[in-house]
Amino acid sequence: MNKNLEFVNSLISQMTVKEKIGQLTMAVSGMNTYDRDNDKFTFRPLLKEQLNEYGIGIVSTLLRADPWSKRTYGTGIELEEREAFINKIQKYVIDNSRLGIPVLIDLEASHGMQALGSVMYPTNICTGCTFDTE
């Protein structure tokens, strides 16, 4: 059997039902998991609570910055900080979960990339409508 498949099967066999359900959830909104004080990011208790209670499979809207998220250049994650911050949240989840399973980062780009420093384009469905030549 493939070593990767063996590893996955071993991991799944160690998981509780609650942990398996947690891997399927996107219950925590990434933009609500951290605070920023100048150049220092700290995780809010919400992240650890969610991780301990249910587990986390997906962190969505981590980089989102718009009026709805209340994230701005003073409070959000800037372009140059993205990679380091995503690595930081991955490390936090791995270090603070029983089996050390990393999370899937969902950037919610179906609405256009709503992140600081991103180029904004219309949503894919709107862009598709522009190619009707008749």
Model regions and ranges:
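N-terminal beta-rich core of secreted/periplasmic extracellular enzymes
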Residues: 1-134
